[in-house]
Amino acid sequence: MVLIRVLANLLILQLSYAQKSSELVTGGHPCNINEHPFLVLVYHDGYQCGGTLINEEWVLTAAHCDGKKMKLQFGLHSKNEPNKDKQTRVPKEKFFCLSSKNFIKWGKDIMLIRLNRPVNNSTHIAPLSLPSSPPSQNTVCNIMGWGTISPTKEIYPDVPHCANINILDHAVCRAFYPGLLEKSKTLCAGILQGGKDICQGDSGGPLICNGQVQGIVSVGGNPCAEPRVPAIYTKVFDHLDWIKSIIAGNTAATCPL
């Protein structure tokens, strides 16, 4: 039986923060240093997640990544040897579809963070575009993060790992995740034969399709990267009106039903 797990993992802070922390991409490869200028490291209270910079003042991540004393790192590649243009921010405001304590409402695991001050675009810092249309089945997409690179052991890399996976039919995910509705605002993605997957510490990170952020890492199987056990991603396209309304200043905007 597939256990549904929250993909945020314990982060052991040492010096700036520890290497044993996130959910890394399993079955991937080290990302190129210039491949992820939008990728954000989100950490707090011993936990680590990923996030996506969508403009100089706003970050998308998962609702279950919420916590006190949250910090966000931008322009990060190697944890041990940070880029000179790395920047750190804290949240000014956070917005949810649901309480961060009730995120397991399929498709509601989304958090929009307004930073305490804008980041400065640089060699290793730049936003990722929101989707112009939803991805179709079989689209090849990219996942990335500092999560564990082993499906059964906590082996955390110094640099984020990347992997290509496919958008799958929702029926594949519904077969393994009880309660997942046919029309839930989620994406089902992975590799049917297994071997590549998000894993512990990748929560909140992006699912990137055709150069746009299409999904937010939400939940997956345990262990990671098992055959025919894909992961579930919050579908960004279905939340576009809410995201754009919040950024425009309509903080009372409601999420899609």
Curated annotation (Swiss-Prot):
One of its GO terms (molecular function) is toxin activity. One of its GO terms (biological process) is proteolysis. Residues 1-18 form the signal peptide. Keywords: Disulfide bond, Glycoprotein, Hemostasis impairing toxin, Hydrolase, Protease, Secreted, Serine protease, Signal, Toxin, Zymogen. Residues 25-248 form the Peptidase S1 domain. Glycans are attached at residues 120-121. One of its GO terms (cellular component) is extracellular region. The keyword Disulfide bond applies. Disulfide bonds join 31-162, 49-65, 97-255, 141-209, 173-188, 199-224. It comes from the Eukaryota. The active site is at residues 64, 109, 203. Its EC number is 3.4.21.-. It is found in: Secreted. Snake venom serine protease that may act in the hemostasis system of the prey. Belongs to the peptidase S1 family. Snake venom subfamily. Monomer. This is Snake venom serine protease KN11. The lineage of its organism: Eukaryota, Metazoa, Chordata, Craniata, Vertebrata.
